[in-house]
From Swiss-Prot:
Lipid biosynthesis listed as a keyword: yes
Protein name: Alkyldihydroxyacetonephosphate synthase, peroxisomal
Keyword annotations from UniProtKB, A to Z: Acetylation, FAD, Flavoprotein, Lipid biosynthesis, Lipid metabolism, Membrane, Peroxisome, Phosphoprotein, Transferase, Transit peptide
Targeting presequence: 1-58
Effect of S367A: Strongly reduced activity
Low complexity compositional bias, start-end: 1-24
Source species of the chain: Cavia porcellus
Residue numbers annotated as active site: Y578
Length: 658
């Protein structure tokens, strides 16, 4: 009975796919929703129906997506998190995020964010202008120039093996050799990459972009690449900040950009085991949106949630801001399917834990596209929390704030998210405060400032602020909140209000747009991260920030750089630290060289002070010069041996890590 019902559900879901084989604009959203519910139902009844369901839908998708040198695609609707084939119709080709979202200074000199996607969109931020002028010494009348559009004649030509192309056409896997599609997938979002897009061009870009729609498509692509000795560079959301997507300049083989964005479905949800089986190209925001319809979430929320994908999370060992409740990606993944040149890697069962030698999953997690393509994954889900509350705490200084976070970690009572900003980062956040709506609100803000700085004696140039996010059962959240604030009080912390905490988290998804604004005014900057033991956190933060200031001064940067940090994740034995640095490069002949030398010096300082090479950004090509010393010669040799066995002819040749 259950098998028959599940078979009917699977058949209906497959039929829905066939019926919706037209463009995205022709699809009925109610029909799509019904199809997802049928997949959920089939998951309940059979537990693991994905094999038959995936094959049926894969065939339907391939039939609907005939191979073409210039595939057309309808941009995703604003409420959808699906990345379209033609990414440039929805997203910036030479900057961060959506085309309709951009920071600018209006006629009154107030900062605004265009579009309607974010809570800050259309909101006037009146104090930012003074902050950016005072911090960087810039003249707002001096603006840089950049290329307004991509000129195909400026891009390297596409060189594709003709025999491969002939066989590819038989598979009906969609592809493109157009310059804009190839350039869009030739980079991530490191400062160097964006700078090149604005003012130059990459020496090497993919020769062809392929859009598989299911696991079987990926198997065919990898087999063809092995047959013709081609290079594959997988891409998910394209949010890499480690040069992970940059094509090796001396690669002479045809380079395939294998774009997983059309592998974006939840294949089933199992409410008994609280797991969901998903395709690896689904973005974080789309995954959360669909799960929310059924009352669930993963809780995995990296800052790149809008665009990064499940496959990208796994391949870089990602971390989310609410890991204190839900865990990092290594805690969430139950099962995965990976296509390699040697074949498919997949465990035979989905048990919660196994003692079967070294965990095969951990060979894939953090492999950064060097071993194969992650096509599907089973991940843990949780019921959507019933209650969420923000908060903030002001400390007299950064050191006392760190001591408080250490005690919270020791007592294992950290909220879903806790972030501690140093003073400069607090000042930056304060510069992004919206215009007050009334005299009364302004008066209250003045009272709060007076109370903290005059009555309690906090120095405005020393104080540090922690933002908090609690979620779960309402009664437990309120108890948890009291426990955290009681600990904070022992370290001189003062409750600074729910609004300040919420505003801090509202900036999470728009802060990346700020770099594009800076580039317009001769400001280049970047963020980078590390993790360190608790007893090294304060010294590491101080020494790295000072090293950045010293390096910039020695290299001729005329105005002191912005050099700031925050503690953004806490653990029993240490913390993750995020650094931001930026400087005014006007008058410097080679700003990229100065930037890269300063960033490298900061990384050297991190390692010298007991920090890790990376907490969650990964290694890529940007940091691989330090990998061997980080994991030892023997450890490095082990990684290389795995690579040599799984991919002996270097089909996955992005040259990350090794």
């Amino acid at each position: 009975m259950a098998e028959a019902a599940a078979a009917a559900a699977a058949a209906a879901a497959a039929g829905e796919t066939s019926a919706s084989s037209g463009s995205a604009a022709e699809r009925d959203p109610d029909q799509d929703r019904a199809g997802r519910r049928l997949r959920v139902l089939s998951g309940h009844l059979l537990g693991r129906p994905q094999e038959a369901l995936s094959t049926n839908e894969c065939k339907a998708r391939r039939a609907a997506s005939a191979a073409t040198a210039a595939p057309t695609a309808t941009p995703a609707a604003p409420e959808s998190g699906i990345i379209p084939k033609k990414r440039q119709e929805l997203m910036k080709w030479n900057g961060w995020g959506y085309n309709d979202s951009k920071f600018f200074l209006n006629k009154k000199g107030q900062l605004e964010l265009t579009g309607k996607r974010y809570p800050l969109s259309g909101v006037a931020l009146p104090t930012f202008k003074d902050w950016i002028q005072n911090t960087f010494g810039i003249n707002l009348d001096h603006k840089t120039t950049s290329k307004a559009s991509l000129n195909p004649s400026d891009t390297p030509p596409s060189i594709v093996n003709e025999d491969f192309l002939h066989e590819l056409k038989k598979t009906n896997i969609s592809y493109s050799q157009e310059a804009d599609d190839r350039v869009f997938r030739a980079h991530g979002h490191c400062l160097h990459e964006i700078f090149l897009l604005r003012e130059g061009m990459f020496e090497r870009i993919p020769d062809i972009v392929l859009w598989p729609t299911c696991h079987d498509d990926v198997v065919k692509i990898v087999n063809l690449a092995c047959k013709y000795n081609l290079c594959i560079i997988p891409i998910g959301g394209g949010t890499s900040v480690s040069y992970g997507l940059m094509c090796p300049a001396d690669e002479t083989r045809t380079i395939i950009s294998l774009d997983t964005s059309q592998m974006n479905r939840i294949l089933w949800v199992d409410e008994n085991n609280l797991t969901a089986h998903v395709e690896a190209g689904i973005t974080g925001q789309e995954l959360e949106r669909q799960l929310k319809e059924s009352g669930y979430c993963t809780g995995h929320e990296p800052d790149s949630l809008e665009f990064s994908t499940v496959g990208g999370w796994i391949s870089t060992r990602a971390s989310g801001m609410k890991k204190n409740i839900y865990g990092n990606i290594e805690d969430l993944v139950v099962h995965m399917k990976v296509v390699t040149p040697r074949g498919v890697i997949e465990k035979s069962c989905q048990g919660p834990r196994m003692s079967t030698g070294p965990d095969i999953h951990h060979f894939i997690m953090g492999s950064e596209g060097t071993l194969g393509v992650i096509t599907e994954a089973t991940i843990k889900i949780r019921p959507t929390p019933e209650y969420q509350k923000y908060g903030s705490v002001a400390f007299p200084n950064f050191e006392q704030g760190v001591a408080c976070l250490r005690e919270i970690a020791k007592q294992r009572c950290a909220p879903a998210s806790i972030r501690l900003m140093d003073n400069q980062q607090f000042q930056f956040g304060h510069a992004l405060k919206p215009q007050v709506s009334s005299i009364f609100t302004s008066f209250l803000d003045g009272l709060k400032k007076f109370y903290i700085t005059k009555f309690k004696g906090f120095d405005p140039n020393q104080l540090s602020v922690a933002t908090l996010l609690f979620e779960g059962d309402r009664e437990k959240v309120l108890q948890h909140e009291k426990q955290v604030y009681d600990i904070a009080a022992k370290f001189g912390g003062l409750a600074a209000g729910e609004d300040n905490g919420q505003r801090g988290y509202l900036l999470t998804y728009v802060i990346a747009y700020m770099r594009d604004l800076g580039l317009e005014y001769y400001i280049i900057g970047e963020s980078f991260e590390t993790s360190a033991p608790w007893d090294r956190v304060v010294d590491l933060c101080r020494n790295v920030k000072e090293r950045i200031r010293r390096e910039c001064k020695e290299k001729g940067v005329q105005f002191p750089p912005l050099s700031t940090c925050r503690v953004t994740q806490t653990y029993d034995a240490g913390a993750c630290i995020y650094f931001y640095f930026a400087f005014n490069y006007r008058g410097i002949s080679d700003p990229l060289a100065v930037f890269e030398q300063t960033e490298a010096a900061a990384r050297e300082e991190i390692l010298a002070n007991g920090g890790s090479l990376s907490h969650h950004h990964g290694v890529g090509k940007l940091r691989k010069q330090w990998l061997k010393e980080s994991i030892s010669d023997v450890g490095f040799g082990m990684l290389k041996s795995v690579k040599d066995y799984v991919d002996p002819t270097n089909i996955f040749g992005n040259r990350n890590l090794l």
